[in-house]
A protein has these predicted regions:
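Terminal targeting signals and extreme-terminal segments of soluble enzymes
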Residues: 10, 16-175
Length: 175
């Protein structure tokens, strides 16, 4: 079920104007619905079949491959994501970044669907507004047999909200 993305095929897909930057035929995960989003051209859904899990707190999540080793994830902050100052709660942004490591990491070419977060370091630089899409730009820095390393930034309408680095540890195939 969890096959590596073919780099050459992914690059060809990224260069295809008809695929809107998505790696066609990519194995994602059977529990994730991944299809073009009709309301957001060029973006693909990243919806979980089981809405009873923690990831449902983020709400609608979209993804877009931006080139080899790069992807962008988008969330739509709602009132339920706000803090007492009516801005996006830092915990909501951290949850979004964690999910972006997996979704964006997968579209960036990393085989990280069966992985756990090993490290996530985030620096908040500005506040995020409710009702305005929030993007996490993810870059795959390095991938080994057991680890994947990322860096990225969270932006809202071009303004830098946060930057982050993270590492995911892939599940062992021995057990």
């Amino acid at each position: 079920l969890f096959q590596d993305v073919k780099t050459a095929a992914c690059r060809a897909a990224l260069e295809s104007p008809t695929l809107s930057g998505h790696c066609a035929g990519m194995d994602v995960h059977p529990a994730i619905r991944h299809a073009p989003d009709p309301d957001h051209p060029g973006w693909w859904s990243w919806d979980f079949a089981d809405d009873g899990k923690f990831h449902a707190v983020v709400g609608k999540l979209l993804v877009r491959a931006d080139g080899p080793g790069r992807a962008t994830c988008r969330m739509f902050p709602e009132e339920r994501h706000s803090n007492l100052g009516d801005m996006i709660h830092g915990g909501a942004i951290l949850t979004f970044i964690d999910m972006a490591l997996f979704a964006g990491g997968r579209l960036a070419g990393a085989n990280v669907i069966r992985a756990v977060t090993l490290d996530l370091s985030t620096r908040f630089l500005s506040r995020g507004r409710i009702g305005v899409p929030l993007d996490a730009e993810v870059e795959l820095l390095r991938e080994t047999k057991r680890l994947a390393f990322f860096a990225g930034r969270v932006v809202q309408e071009g303004a830098l909200i946060a930057h982050f680095t993270g590492a995911l540890r892939k599940a062992s195939t021995d057990s």
